[in-house]
Every structure is written in structure tokens, then in C-alpha cells.
Amino acid sequence: LSTATSQAAPAVVVTDLVKQFGRFAALRGVSAAFDGGKLYAILGDNGAGKTTLLRTVAGLNRPTRGEVRVLSSTNHREICAQIGYMAHPSLLYDEMSGMENLRYYGQLYGIRDETRYELTIRNVGLDPELQRAVGQYSQGMRQRMSLARAMLHDPKILLLDEPFSNVDIHSAKTMVGLLVKIRDDGKTIFIVTHQASLLEGAADEFVWMQHGKIIARTLGLLPPPEVA
């Protein structure tokens, strides 16, 4: 597990966060602080509010009420610059090669430094596959390419929605290993997943959600009584 201390200012703070879609409240007054340099697993049933929380922290959903503070900032542009978001399903172009996908997103971020591309690709282990069309990738390779896209602008915080979805166990464990290394290099990582057992021994904290609220935070995978 990460050895990062909790004495520095939290990386992410949400205060009384509410998000409504029409009459449905997807988030119901969520307040929490998350330290930097840690890996958090966000768990709960479908409809618990996991992805909505992730998207709201990322700035993709505007909160109905409440505040999101990332690295002490509430400025939307500053927050977006510090966050890498991996969507589910992945936002990749099948007809383009892996490198073409990265360069497309790199242009959006204004990345011109070639070493940034090289380092990102090396970090996810996709060097030999860059010239192949993404449509020919296995699901595990697609997920690693999605992770590369999220990491390309060197954000301090990664928000990953179902990164282990539809991949075989070997690919999933490879992804977990990558994420642990990335966390150990100082990134803060939030992972929404229904495959919590993959993160046992890797996650610093398990965050349990139900009905749009965080109901418990545990150091181990044993669920709290409310969701047992």
C-alpha cells in the first residue's frame, strides 16, 4: 500500500455535493476529503452514484449544489488540467492507430513534447502496438490505451470508470500492477469498479456508496454492515 501521509492538504474535497437529473438525485449531499498519492476503490451497486461522483469531480457534470475542490482549487479550468478521466466505454477511435489516437488527444491538450508521448506509451506497455488500428486491439489493450490517453497530459489525479470491464483476469491483473506503479509514482487514483477483489492489497481505501451517498470508508475489502 501507499506510504503517503494524510498530513498534506487533501487532493480532492467534495462538500455537500448534490447532483440531480430531473427529479432523480444521483448524489445526495456527499461530503468527503481524499488525500493525495493514494488509490481509492469506489464501490457500490448500480445506481449508487459512483460514476456520477467521478464525472462531477472531473467537471463533466455540473453539481446541482455543493462544491468540488481539487488540489485546493475550485476553478474549472485548473481542475480539468489536473485530472485525467478514463470513461466507460473507452473514448477511442477504432479506425485510427494507437499513436494516432494519442496524437489526436495530445493536440487537444496542446502537447508538442515527443518525450511525453514516449513516456506515456512506455508506462502502459504498448510500445509494440502503436501502429496497429485500435479496432484490432484486444479489450485489455484498449483499456491500457484508454489509460494512456487519460495520462497523456501528466495529470496529478486519475479518475477511472470500470477499467477492468470485459477484460480477462490476466489483463486485469496487468492493469492493477500498472496502476499501483502509477500510484507509487505519486498520482492519486480513483477507480469505480464492480470487481473489487482485484484491488484487494492494492487499494489504500475502499469507499462504499449507496443511494447517492458515501456510507463507509474501509481499509480492507470487508463490506460495512450497511452493505454486507
Whereabouts are the PLM-identified features?
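H-loop/switch region of ABC-family ATPase nucleotide-binding domains
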Residues: 192-194
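Conserved ABC ATPase "signature" region
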Residues: 103, 114-129
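Conserved ABC transporter NBD signature motif
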Residues: 66-79
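The feature captures the beta-strand-to-loop junction immediately N-terminal to the Walker
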Residues: 43-45
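Catalytic Walker B motif of ABC-type/P-loop ATPase nucleotide-binding domains
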Residues: 158-161
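Helix-to-loop junction immediately C-terminal to a conserved catalytic motif
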Residues: 58
